[in-house]
Every structure is written in structure tokens, then in C-alpha cells.
């Protein structure tokens, strides 16, 4: 064991915390702990580049969300005496229960009488705690049914695709990030499920129609993919759209007004909508 390690600390607004965690995971950082209203990142390697990258990422988010204040504060980088911080990191990750779905890490015990979803957080791309993912998990328990042809559009960690597979759907996944596909396939293996098809890219590469599509991606991308999404919906198919900031909700509803809005949910500023393809008008 090396004698010293580097510790990067910062405080981030709760609503944006998961964006920063996913950003760090995407850069290959595995030892992250949430504690004392802040985030600790530890490594034997220098974290100076990561510190700089987090500041740039925060600036971009501030611009994207039109904020007039800083998202992160108290950013500090120190060198410390070593200890088993991997075990400390594991203690800081909490499982999440969404109705009957229990999402937990590979080292946490399963919960009886629940649908257990096992995730390796070191694989990045989300662990189910974000408001948008939470909403999708609730909706999928209602609309996932055996033998449905389903698509997880922008699969990330594969949590949503795994849930649909657990309910008996024939699931396909896609993401524009090859690492997300790898992460999803590995998490599927951990959960004993298979995806019917997986590809790096978007819905334009999909073949045929789907009975269920879930897209937990940002509003701008949903708006860009609107026509492709609709063109791949079977009659009476269910479409779940999530990852939408409330300031974009009106635009989303306008674009999808030809479908029947059958359910919606908002947690903090994050909105999710469920549509049925009844071919209105």
C-alpha cells in the first residue's frame, strides 16, 4: 500500500450532484464518497487535472442552466496519509428502493421479496439515484410486460433495460457512447439477463417497431430525435421520456402532442412523461 494519496473535495448543489458523479466516473475515477454534504474523490495519482476538469464542467452547467451562482464550492485538493479508502468509499454508497425494485451495488445484500438490480458503480453512467432515473423506474414497473419488444434509448448503465428484461421484455439497448454499451452489458451479466440487441449509436439504427421505448436523456436530444422515436412506435406503444428540466417541459409536450399523454411526474426540476401511441389526429 502506498503511503500517501490525493483527496479532492467539493460541495455541490444536491440537484446537480449526480451529474458530477457521472462525470467523474466517466473519467475513470472509482473511489468517490458522498459525506458531510460534500463529495470526496481519492486516488494515488494526482487529481490536479480532474480538479480543473470539474471547474470547467461546472462552468458549462452554469451556462446551460442559465444560473447566476456557482454550482460547486469549497473545491480543495490535499495530499494525505493512506488508509483503506476503498472500503470507506463502499460505506458511502447507499442502495435505493423504488416501489418493488431494489437497486444496490455488487457488495450489498439483496432485499427479499423485491426485484433486485445489481450495479457496479465503478462502471459509471448512473446508479439510479437521479430524479429522472427514479421516475423511469417507477413507470417501468407499471408498463413493462412479458414479451413486449422494448428499447432503452440512451441506456447509460443499463438499469432501465435490465428492469424491463426482469419483467420479461425483449430488450434492445443503444447509446452513442461505447463505454455505456460496455457498462450496460456488464451490468446485465451481473443481473443474469440478456439484451436481444445492443449497438453504439441512436434510434436511427433501430429496425422495426417497439411496444415500449424509454428515453432517459436530455430534452434537447429528445427534441432532435422526436420523429425517429415516433417512427419506431408500434400502435398503442408506450413511450417514456425523462431527463427533462421543467423549463423544457412545454416544448416537449408541444412536440409530442399528437400522442396521448397518460402519466407524468416531476421531482424537483426534473420532469418525466408517459405517452401512448394512439395516433391522434
Swiss-Prot record:
Entries under InterPro entries matching the protein: Ribosomal_L11_MeTrfase_PrmA, Ribosomal_PrmA_MeTrfase, SAM-dependent_MTases_sf
EC class: transferase
Binding site for S-adenosyl-L-methionine: 133, 154, 175, 216
Database matches in Pfam families: PrmA
GO BP: methylation
Primary location: cytoplasm
Subcellular localization, as worded in the UniProt entry: Cytoplasm
Gene3D superfamilies: Vaccinia Virus protein VP39
Molecular function via GO: protein-lysine N-methyltransferase activity
EC number: 2.1.1.-
Catalysed reaction, written as an equation: L-lysyl-[protein] + 3 S-adenosyl-L-methionine = N(6),N(6),N(6)-trimethyl-L-lysyl-[protein] + 3 S-adenosyl-L-homocysteine + 3 H(+)
Keyword Methyltransferase: yes
GO cellular component terms listed in the entry, alphabetical order: cytoplasm
Protein keywords: Cytoplasm, Methyltransferase, S-adenosyl-L-methionine, Transferase
NCBIfam families: PRK00517.2-4 (NF001786)
Entry's family note: Belongs to the methyltransferase superfamily. PrmA family.
Purpose: Methylates ribosomal protein L11.
Protein name: Ribosomal protein L11 methyltransferase
Organism: Campylobacter jejuni subsp. jejuni serotype O:23/36 (strain 81-176)
Amino acid at each position: 500500500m502506498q503511503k500517501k494519496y490525493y483527496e479532492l473535495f467539493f460541495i455541490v448543489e444536491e440537484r446537480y450532484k449526480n451529474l458530477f458523479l457521472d462525470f467523474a466516473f466517466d473519467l475513470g475515477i472509482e473511489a468517490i464518497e458522498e459525506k458531510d454534504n460534500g463529495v470526496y474523490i481519492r486516488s494515488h495519482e494526482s487529481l490536479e487535472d480532474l480538479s480543473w476538469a470539474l471547474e470547467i464542467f461546472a462552468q458549462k452547467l452554469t451556462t446551460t442552466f442559465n444560473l447566476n451562482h456557482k454550482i460547486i464550492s469549497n473545491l480543495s485538493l490535499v495530499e494525505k496519509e493512506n488508509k483503506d479508502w476503498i472500503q470507506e468509499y463502499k460505506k458511502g454508497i447507499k442502495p435505493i428502493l423504488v416501489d418493488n425494485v431494489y437497486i444496490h451495488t455488487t457488495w450489498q445484500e439483496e432485499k427479499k421479496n423485491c426485484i433486485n438490480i445489481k450495479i457496479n458503480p465503478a462502471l459509471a453512467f448512473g446508479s439510479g439515484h437521479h430524479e429522472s432515473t427514479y421516475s423511469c423506474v417507477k413507470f417501468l414497473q407499471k408498463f413493462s410486460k412479458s414479451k413486449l419488444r422494448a428499447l432503452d434509448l440512451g441506456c447509460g448503465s443499463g438499469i432501465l433495460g435490465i428492469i424491463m428484461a426482469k419483467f420479461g421484455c425483449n430488450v434492445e439497448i443503444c447509446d452513442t457512447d461505447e463505454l455505456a454499451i460496455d457498462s450496460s452489458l456488464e451490468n446485465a451479466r451481473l443481473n443474469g439477463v440478456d439484451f436481444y440487441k445492443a449497438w453504439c449509436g441512436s434510434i436511427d439504427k433501430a429496425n422495426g417497431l417497439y411496444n415500449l421505448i424509454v428515453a432517459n436523456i436530455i430534452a434537447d436530444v429528445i427534441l432532435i430525435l422526436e420523429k425517429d422515436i415516433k417512427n419506431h412506435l408500434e400502435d398503442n406503444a408506450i413511450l417514456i421520456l425523462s431527463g427533462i428540466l421543467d423549463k423544457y417541459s412545454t416544448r416537449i409536450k408541444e412536440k409530442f402532442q399528437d400522442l396521448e399523454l397518460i402519466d407524468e411526474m416531476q421531482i424537483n426540476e426534473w420532469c418525466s412523461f408517459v405517452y401512448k401511441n394512439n395516433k391522434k389526429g
